[in-house]
Amino acid sequence: MTMKQYTMSKMNAETQTQTRESFPTDDPAVVTCGLPYANGDLHIGHLRTYVGGDIFSRALKRLGQETAFVSGSDMHGTPVAVNAAEEGVTPESFALRHHEQYETTFPQFGIEFDNYGHTHDETNVEMTREIVEALIQAGYVYEREIPVAYDPAADQWLPDRFVNGTCPYCGAHARGDECDEGCGRHLEPGEIETPVSTITGNDAEYRRREHQFFAVSELQSYLSSFLDRLEGTTNAQNQPREWVEGELQDWCITRDMDWGVDYPDDNDLVLYVWVDAPIEYISSTKQYAERVGTDSFDWKNAWRDIPGVRSHSSSSAKDSSEGNSPSNINNGGEIIHIIGRDIIQHHTVFWPAMLHAAGYTEPRAVMASGFITLEGKGFSTSRNRAVWADEYLAEGFHPDLLRYYLATNGGFQQDVDFSWSRFRERVNNELVGTVGNFIYRSLLFAAREFDGTPDVALSDSVEERIETAIDAFTAGVNEYSVRAVGDAAVKLAQFGNEYIQHHEPWKLSNDDPQKQQVMRDCIQLAKAIAVLFEPVTPAAAERVWADLGESGDIHTVGIESALVAPPQTFDEPTELFEKIPEERVDELTAKLADRVTDPTDDDDSDTDTETGTDVAETTNESHSESNMTEIDPIADERIDFEEFEELDLRVAEIIETEPIEDADKLARIVVDLGIEQRQLVAGIRQLHDLDDLIGETVVIVANLEKAEIFGVESNGMLLAAGADADLLTTREDADPGTSIQ
């Protein structure tokens, strides 16, 4: 952290109030994933959000929470229209082709949506018109004349991606609706400077045109209170405050196009893609309910807030505190949005404003994933710098391996890097060496020695250990930590390996009660691991379930099954995971390097995201999601080299974290420095999920004077960048204690 942050952390303390019931609740839950643009092929960087959503949905169901997991393809918007025109096909046929591809690809990776629709289907078109009509009737939509980019040579209006230019806020090159190369801000029509048509390459001109606006500014008070209630990852909770607490601008919700959902009573305008795209969450839930029956899942109970809609006056910035209280804000279900962090603004400002004004349930939580890099650099589909989803499968790797890597390789909101060498290391050491090794050796030994599970009671100590793992799993769900959900099973497997190794049952005779007890405990541990690991590695869990001779479907059992006695007889198992040879890594790394084309400009990665995951070029690159932070000027005063040498900067590994009582921003961090452990106090609690930091490599100032902060001794300083406290780390795996020079 900076010295300013360090000083402020010593001065500030705030408290939080938990307002929502923990999962599982009696209300229906809807878990959604950001809609992928039906615009190109999927690579593994795109899959992080969808794997995370699938894991979280499965985990909720495991706890007994009534849950619908839904998403769909985004068929509309200018990127689809632009690319369809380049291919000489209609936008609908272009988008449908990619939609059908996604319908095939997601299940191949164990991503099992309860419903996967698309924004151009009849259900979503009707639902969109219904909600927009509700906004109009409530007085939240008005007409305004604005400047709109126009190409005289093409005789065409230029909405969104049909125009490029300069961002008025930071001066970077930008698209018509987004500063994608600079500050990341959403741009309204008419804002972009020096506009250029992407159709002809000519300079565009601005002409006045009437468009429809949604009065987001009238909901500023509501949005501020909504953010106070919002759960999820800390980036989704904190990033929107700068927008909501600033000068909130109304939102242009129409475009001059013929591809999209028509604006009511005006066939010359279509709705902006960010209006109809999130409504697909509701439409997809409705389709699911219609398929299974409302007795199984009632979509209205999940999505509808209160009868009717709020009028402009009752839901405006003049809302009373009573109108914004949690008791009458949210009368529907538990809505959890799982997205990429580049679309936080849409899901925490525009979308909840629409829902609230139209009388629908506000989101309970938004979980925003970090980006994924590929061997330290951004994915670039235009340069073929990517590991494609179909390529991963064609190389013979099981989807569960990638699911585990994406779920547990860092916290969900943190950026993570994919490399074939790191992938091999995680698979061989953790899946093969820890989880697979324990389950295989336990089941094999029990099958050979006892034909299955010894007929003795589970020991109290192992039962308590499984209960602890169940508690950790449940806590992970309620803390919105995908990593913690996966770690619960892995830590139980680590315990199992230590347990069987300590007791060495192979040295005992079959009539020794101790041998029977140890193997009874180990088989129960194996079953518990399968139950807890199913959300992360569903296919592997299914195999363990079958190897145990269990009946029924492991994908539908409750978490309490982890403590139900396993069958007494089963056959010898097969090995769960296979090691990846080092030569495979060399082969795959070389294959990637050989095919990557030279960059055409200074950018290492393409960026093209609109309603979720834009797969035409790429998403999840390493650029900042907003870059709206003001950069401090570089200090004029210099220090000499001797002064710099006085700083003892060390690589450290975080081994323990906990919040400091009565200090909302402070956390106690214990780090391993190789030769000793140190305790630090850091003001990062509101910016990071503390559990996700365990095992992270960081940089600290090791020779800073000790300080007492909120009664806790701090022996060093954790270094981080910017207001979001982006923790400094090393590119390679430097050992704890390594000096930084």
UniProtKB/Swiss-Prot annotation:
Residues reported in the UniProt entry to bind ATP? T381
- Keywords on this record? Aminoacyl-tRNA synthetase, ATP-binding, Cytoplasm, Ligase, Metal-binding, Nucleotide-binding, Protein biosynthesis, RNA-binding, tRNA-binding, Zinc
Q: Where is this region: Disordered?
A: 1-25, 309-329, 591-629
Per its UniProt record, the required cofactor names are: Zn(2+)
One biological process term from GO is:
methionyl-tRNA aminoacylation
Pfam families listed in its UniProt record: Anticodon_3, tRNA-synt_1g, tRNA_bind
**Which molecular function terms from Gene Ontology are attached?**
ATP binding; metal ion binding; methionine-tRNA ligase activity; tRNA binding
Q: Where is the tRNA-binding domain?
A: 643-741
GO cellular component, as recorded: aminoacyl-tRNA synthetase multienzyme complex; cytosol
Q: What is this protein called?
A: Methionine--tRNA ligase
Species of origin: Haloquadratum walsbyi (strain DSM 16790 / HBSQ001)
What does the organism's lineage look like at the top?
Archaea, Methanobacteriati, Methanobacteriota, Stenosarchaea group, Halobacteria
Point out the gene that encodes the protein: metG
